[in-house]
Amino acid sequence: MERSMNFDEILSHIGGFGKFQKILYVWICLPQVLLAFHMLISVFTGAVPPHLCRSNNTTWALPASSDAFNFSLVTGPDDDPDLSCSAPGGVPSTPLAQLNHSTALALSDDHITGVCQGGWEYSKETFHSTVATEWDLVCDNANLNNIGSSIYMFGLLVGAVLFGSLADKFGRRNIILVGLTIQSTFGVGAAFAPNFYIYVFLRFVVGTTISAVIMNAFVLGTEWTGSKHRMLAGIITDYFFGFGYITLAGLAYLIRDWRKLQLAISAPGFLFIFYIWVLPKSARWLMANQRNEEAMDLIRKAALMNGKPLQEDIEIYQGYNDMVKMEERKKDTVIDLVRTPKMRRNSCIMFYLCVSSTIPSLCLSRFVNVLVYYGLSLNISDFGMNIYLTQLIFGLVEMPARTITLFTLNRSRRISQLAFLAVGGLACLLTIFIPDDLSIIRTVLAMVGKFGITASLSIVYVYSAEVFPTVIRQSGIGMSSMCARAGGVLAPIIYLLRGVSKNAPMVLFGLCTLLGAALTLLLPETAHQPLADTIEDVEGSSISEESEEGNMKPALYEECPTRNPDIII
């Protein structure tokens, strides 16, 4: 007996998470490791090691061991002017290697600050070379380092907008391939940059491709996965990103030269050239764009690989093809994200959730780093903590946060998002009531906040892919990613509010996160629900009702009730 099936029913029929999908996930997860490298590499390549100005008459050699030379004597938190930015007007009476914290503070008060004429002397205990040491991005030039990081984050924002729209037009697979190619080429180029400005430009381009690959790999996995396993599209890729987070610590420990490290994380990207032959297109996207024969070929291939071959008489419902052959047909654009009531509500809330999750995540990392810094400044260095171990621990903290979402997402997307945002927001607010001398408790609370925010970030990408319909899904995720990247640009600015009040940043993003938790209640529950393919699917009867009253029914829906073809079996 023949019956029509929508695409989610097709996936269920051929296997929503069979061998075909599992192999696909291998292909979309492998690049995530390199993406983590590119995202976090500036922690090491942009690091500023201990440094002093060489006098024209005297060279101040830095001790080889941190036991003899306290890191806090030459670098302070938040780029405060200190001993490292002082041009020596005379040789201090106390030998540099014997300075303690209080002596250094007294010395810096009397030290003459000016332009360093003799050049900079950098410690090579931790880093052999960095971007900062090669181009002297310290003191008066320190802001260039920060600006470079902001420009890179702006690249992610540009990529989210640019490649989000291009993917809806040219397909997820094509944009992934283009993104990986550009990323590897410009990443390798950055390792040979002749000056800082060219380096920043090359990193900006790499940043745009990060968004291209992350978004489209995620959507490609989502559109090939049945509703029961759809959450894996976000969580599994997050695991591989977390693995890259952890692995980078070891790689950077072994490679202390920034150019060699930049080359080591970029060159392997060329190995993905074989994706041209193995990475499939999205059958759902092909159908939504009337490329039905290609879609059916892929569906048959997936069915055969999953051990559930389709019957030979399967064909695309011809009535659908007649309906879509209109003389003038509306093209879906980014404007459609806010054109209709429910889409407008869902889109605005999703955009806000992306911003309110990203800013606290970045600020919390900085907050914990500053607490660790102050601990080291007070000579609490017997724990053996260093930048490589700290990076490793931060990566490990994210793994349980991503793991717990595997158990909560199956029950509810909406409640899971709400709960983790609430945990993150409350933890942020609680830190302001902890005295400064209880820094360990404040650090633990900050890490709890980071745990909640990390979990919410894992959920929001799964959630957003299900809230937006197929015809504008990539545009919706692209705009969401753009908002998240905007949060990345804003995070350092918000952290500057510490100059007004040390608790201001925590209060601000704690309240913003709690507001996001409340707004989540207005979103639809998407767990175990079929993906919407058209805006009409999202709006339901509201479009028809508004059409009768205000004649605002889009041309797309006048003759075609759905852009997702029915299948006759």
Where are these regions (language model features)?
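C-terminal transmembrane bundle
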Residues: A36, L40, R203, D238, ...
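Flexible cytoplasmic loops linking transmembrane helices in multi-pass membrane transporters
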Residues: E2-K22, V74-N143, L304-L378, D382, ...
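Cytoplasmic membrane-interface "Motif A"-like loop-to-helix N-cap segments
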Residues: K169-G179, M231-L232, R344-N346, F407-A422
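Structural signature of the two symmetry-related core transmembrane helices
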Residues: N174-G189, Y197, Y239, S416-L430
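Central mid-sequence intracellular linker of multi-pass
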Residues: P49-H111, Q117, L254-E327, G510-E549
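Helix-breaking motifs and short loop linkers at transmembrane-helix boundaries and internal kinks
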Residues: G171, F192-Y197, T209, I255, ...
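Cytoplasmic helix-loop-helix junction between adjacent transmembrane helices
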Residues: F196, L202-Y239, G250
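Conserved glycine-rich helix-kink/hinge and helix-boundary motifs of the Major Facilitator Superfamily
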Residues: C29, N146, L177, M231-D238, ...
